[in-house]
Amino acid sequence: MSLYMLVSTFAVAFIITVIGVPLFIPFLVKLKFGQSIRDEGPKMHEKKSGTPTMGAVIFITAMLISFLIFSFISGEVSAATWLLFITLALFGALGFLDDYIKVVQKRNLGLTSKQKFLGQVAISILFYLVYHFSDFAETLKIPFTNTEIDLGWFFIIFILFWLVGFSNAVNLTDGLDGLVSGLSVIAFSAFGVIAFYQEQMDVAIFCFAIVGGMLGFLLFNKNPAKIFMGDTGSLALGGSIAAVSILVHQEWLLLLIGIIFVIETASVILQVFYFKATGGKRIFRMTPIHHHFELGGWSEWRVVLTFWGIGLIGAIISVCVVIF
């Protein structure tokens, strides 16, 4: 019965997305909600200018509908259900505001860094408050052991770092057609299997709703992309995957399951630090690191497939660590 629920959750999110996206694309085109390409980006990306963005509105809607339907049908409505719901919805809303400013008000950078950060912090604090008053364990598991450390009030610092950090990490990674969509399918599949193995059906249902929605969206987001998810999607997915890792108490495995997100973010941090320390020298041709490979002659599709492969290896290892 539980496996049937997961398959059904996946299927409904997938079907709604596959039906909804083709209907949404002409609407976005009519409103001229097209992606602007930053001048400092790779020149080969200029052809993407005007591609409809904010496609995440469809797959987030599909995910939330499927998630809630099968959470109630299965009787698996819990505090975790509402934590995941508000995380996906609120990070998505923050991203939507950022996208709206970019495409409607024609401010290419969207929200300022300070505004976006304050929004992320506010959502993370709300997550902590719901988590805290739901009597979840505020502990951190030591990797490859069964030992957990009680963080006490320091747990809120960890929550802020984890949710804000990974929402930004996924946002940084979303620069190539299909890259984040495919990585999300891989990562949430891994966490879905882990949650199912740990008998956390509420979290597993959420994960497979996301897998269904993202796989449906990938059909239109793969190279050459007909639509982009925008910050609406990348912030929502990043915040959600961090939340899932906390709820299944496998936080550190996210560093392996989401290894590409970590590498992409690290490349930006290293580039900025080295640039400032050396007075203008660079480690990479351009960051995030996927652009480094593009400028080195790799096709966009080759970069995406390679990064998917690395993400898949990390996900398989992580699932094996938990199960075996």
Swiss-Prot record:
Q: Pathway membership of this protein?
A: Cell wall biogenesis; peptidoglycan biosynthesis
Q: Which InterPro entries match?
A: Glycosyl_transferase_4, PNAcMuramoyl-5peptid_Trfase, PNAcMuramoyl-5peptid_Trfase_CS
- Keyword terms, alphabetized: Cell cycle, Cell division, Cell membrane, Cell shape, Cell wall biogenesis/degradation, Magnesium, Membrane, Metal-binding, Peptidoglycan synthesis, Transferase, Transmembrane, Transmembrane helix
User: What are its E.C. numbers?
Assistant: 2.7.8.13
Needed co-factor(s): Mg(2+)
Q: Which reaction does it catalyse?
A: UDP-N-acetyl-alpha-D-muramoyl-L-alanyl-gamma-D-glutamyl-meso-2,6-diaminopimeloyl-D-alanyl-D-alanine + di-trans,octa-cis-undecaprenyl phosphate = di-trans,octa-cis-undecaprenyl diphospho-N-acetyl-alpha-D-muramoyl-L-alanyl-D-glutamyl-meso-2,6-diaminopimeloyl-D-alanyl-D-alanine + UMP
Q: Where is this protein chiefly located?
A: membrane
What compartments host this protein? Answer: Cell membrane
At the top level, the lineage of the source is: Bacteria
Pfam families reported for this sequence = Glycos_transf_4 (PF00953)
Q: Which CDD domains match?
A: GT_MraY (cd06852)
Q: Which GO terms describe its molecular function?
A: metal ion binding; phospho-N-acetylmuramoyl-pentapeptide-transferase activity; UDP-N-acetylmuramoyl-L-alanyl-D-glutamyl-meso-2,6-diaminopimelyl-D-alanyl-D-alanine:undecaprenyl-phosphate transferase activity
Question: What Gene Ontology cellular-component terms does the record carry?
Answer: plasma membrane
Query: Mind listing the GO biological process terms from this record?
Result: cell division; cell wall organization; peptidoglycan biosynthetic process; regulation of cell shape
Membrane topology qualifier: Multi-pass membrane protein
Looking at the UniProt entry, the stretches that span the membrane are 9-29, 53-73, 77-97, 117-137, 149-169, 176-196, 201-221, 227-247, 253-273, 304-324
Q: Which residues form the signal peptide?
A: none
- Family assignment? Belongs to the glycosyltransferase 4 family. MraY subfamily.
Function in brief = Catalyzes the initial step of the lipid cycle reactions in the biosynthesis of the cell wall peptidoglycan: transfers peptidoglycan precursor phospho-MurNAc-pentapeptide from UDP-MurNAc-pentapeptide onto the lipid carrier undecaprenyl phosphate, yielding undecaprenyl-pyrophosphoryl-MurNAc-pentapeptide, known as lipid I.
Q: PANTHER family under this entry? A: PHOSPHO-N-ACETYLMURAMOYL-PENTAPEPTIDE-TRANSFERASE, PHOSPHO-N-ACETYLMURAMOYL-PENTAPEPTIDE-TRANSFERASE HOMOLOG
- Name assigned to this protein: Phospho-N-acetylmuramoyl-pentapeptide-transferase
Source species? Listeria innocua serovar 6a (strain ATCC BAA-680 / CLIP 11262)
